[in-house]
């Protein structure tokens, strides 16, 4: 087999083999464009078709999910599990329930997950799954029957040393509980095969808070290394769900002034900044009433920008926590005119063009595989607690989480340059790649 001699020939070959998968191709392009100079300096990583194997999932499982709705009608959905790479441990990654779910998105997420999990320093491989099922507006009975029907096929592909899923968009603690319960019934085994579980049956403290907390821990380390900090900074947060809420909570502890949140309907702007009391009000609307940001704005008498994202609001720090590709080149051109740092709380919320614009402008930029890895890290800590049949106090989990995020930041600096300004994209990509690649080379051609 002839191996590609340039990044463009490698990516062209990948595109021929994966047509009509834009999200996946974007993710691979972003990683390998930054990796290629490092690979050229280290030719050992071109041996054994390592790169070609690295971009091909080890296994893709696709199946139908047939279930009965509240009216007695049979519904059919499509579901997937992409078991991407197990070189350093069992496949690990969430199950996403959303109408947009397709193979391209799940391959992109599984690919990213492989490197993100490697960065945590915990023994976890990369995987991702999901279904085009939409839980919005559906009764608890419908959601339960769907989750149970899905598990009648998925259960045979899971195990504590094989594949350990978790929640994701549209798949929270309730859905994880339904799936974990059905898994236990089908397998007659109570071993840990899901993370993100409820505290009453093996969940970990700090898990709901982890991604948001970790995003702030990493961003603060990045700021501190460059002589900055959160105190007094104007912060734009996109999204208003779990990640956004706990990002705001931790940023407030560091005396930041968070002035935006958003959802698919538009953006709220609060120039006075969030407080603990305001955040509790937002959480009550979003988590208990399942309301919208517009409802919060109306009840508070605040500015609401219908149909707009937060990026037109002047800020010092931008933390995109909503969804992929929400921050494009046009938004980057606006926001970079004063922003000092951007850190990804969602998975790939910044387009390649926007990322390049930030880096060209000298803006500190933290990619999601590093900055939002804390959710995964805490999932790994949940697996460790389950394996030992113990539960740790919240303080212990939080301390471990802070250490893990500090280690990730250190690895990014080590590989991204220890000079005046670290290139965190290169650092994160190279650090994750090296760990996975070394494991694959050591294990032979598989």
UniProtKB/Swiss-Prot annotation:
Pfam families documented for this protein: ELFV_dehydrog, ELFV_dehydrog_N
Broad class of enzyme this protein falls into:
oxidoreductase
Kindly list the residues the record flags as site (Important for catalysis).
Answer: 168
Catalyzed reaction equations: L-glutamate + NADP(+) + H2O = 2-oxoglutarate + NH4(+) + NADPH + H(+)
Q: What is this protein called?
A: NADP-specific glutamate dehydrogenase
Q: Which residues bind NADP(+)?
A: 211, 242
Name the family the entry cites.
Belongs to the Glu/Leu/Phe/Val dehydrogenases family.
Q: Which InterPro entries match?
A: Aminoacid_DH-like_N_sf, Glu/Leu/Phe/Val/Trp_DH, Glu/Leu/Phe/Val/Trp_DH_C, Glu/Leu/Phe/Val/Trp_DH_dimer, Glu/Leu/Phe/Val_DH_AS, Glu_DH, Glu_Leu_Phe_Val_DH, NAD(P)-bd_dom_sf
GO terms in the biological process aspect are: glutamate biosynthetic process
Give the highest taxon in the source lineage. Answer: Bacteria
Q: Which GO terms describe its molecular function?
A: glutamate dehydrogenase (NADP+) activity
Subunit comment: Homohexamer.
> Which organism does this sequence originate in?
Unknown prokaryotic organism
List its EC numbers. Answer: 1.4.1.4
What does this protein's UniProt record list under function?
Catalyzes the reversible oxidative deamination of glutamate to a-ketoglutarate and ammonia.
What does UniProt list as catalytic? 128 (proton donor)
GO cellular component, alphabetical, reads: cytoplasm; cytosol
- Keyword set for this entry? NADP, Oxidoreductase
Q: Which residues bind substrate?
A: 92, 113, 116, 167, 379
């Amino acid at each position: 087999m002839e191996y590609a001699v340039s990044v463009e020939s490698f990516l062209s070959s990948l595109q021929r083999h994966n047509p009509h998968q834009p999200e996946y191709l974007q993710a691979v392009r972003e990683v390998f464009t930054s990796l290629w100079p490092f690979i050229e300096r280290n030719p050992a990583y071109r041996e054994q078709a390592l790169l070609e194997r690295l971009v091909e999932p080890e296994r893709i499982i696709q199946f139908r999910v047939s279930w009965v709705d509240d009216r007695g009608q049979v519904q059919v959905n499509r579901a997937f599990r992409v078991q991407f790479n197990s070189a350093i441990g069992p496949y690990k990654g969430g199950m996403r329930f959303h109408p947009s779910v397709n193979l391209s998105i799940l391959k992109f997420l599984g690919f990213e997950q492989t490197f993100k999990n490697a960065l945590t320093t915990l023994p976890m491989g990369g995987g991702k799954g999901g279904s085009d099922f939409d839980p919005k507006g559906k009764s608890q009975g419908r959601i339960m029957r769907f989750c149970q029907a899905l598990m009648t096929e998925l259960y045979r592909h899971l195990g504590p040393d094989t594949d350990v899923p978790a929640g994701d968009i549209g798949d929270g603690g309730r859905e994880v509980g339904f799936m974990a319960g059905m898994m236990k019934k089908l397998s007659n085994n109570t071993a840990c095969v899901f993370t993100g579980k409820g505290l009453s049956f093996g969940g970990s403290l700090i898990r709901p808070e982890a991604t948001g907390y970790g995003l702030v821990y990493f961003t603060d380390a990045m700021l501190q290394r460059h002589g900055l900090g959160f105190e007094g900074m104007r912060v734009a947060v996109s999204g208003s769900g779990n990640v956004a809420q706990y990002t705001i909570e931790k940023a407030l502890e560091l005396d930041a002034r968070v002035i935006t949140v958003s959802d698919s309907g538009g953006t709220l702007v609060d120039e006075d900044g969030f407080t603990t009391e305001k955040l509790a009000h937002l959480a009550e609307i979003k988590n208990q009433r399942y309301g919208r940001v517009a409802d919060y704005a109306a009840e508070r008498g605040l500015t609401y920008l219908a149909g707009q994202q937060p990026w037109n609001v002047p800020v010092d720090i931008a933390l995109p926590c909503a969804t992929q590709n929400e921050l494009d080149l046009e938004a980057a051109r606006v926001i970079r005119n004063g922003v000092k740092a951007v850190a990804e709380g969602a998975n790939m919320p910044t387009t390649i063009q926007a990322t390049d614009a930030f880096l060209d402008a000298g803006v500190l930029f933290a990619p999601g595989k590093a900055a939002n890895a804390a959710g995964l890290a805490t999932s790994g800590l949940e697996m460790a607690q389950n394996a030992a049949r113990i539960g740790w106090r919240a303080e212990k989990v939080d301390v471990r989480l802070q250490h893990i995020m500090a280690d990730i930041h250190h690895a990014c600096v080590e590989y991204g340059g220890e000079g005046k300004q670290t290139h965190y994209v290169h650092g994160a990509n190279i650090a994750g790649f090296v760990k996975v690649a070394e494991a694959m080379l050591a294990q032979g051609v598989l």
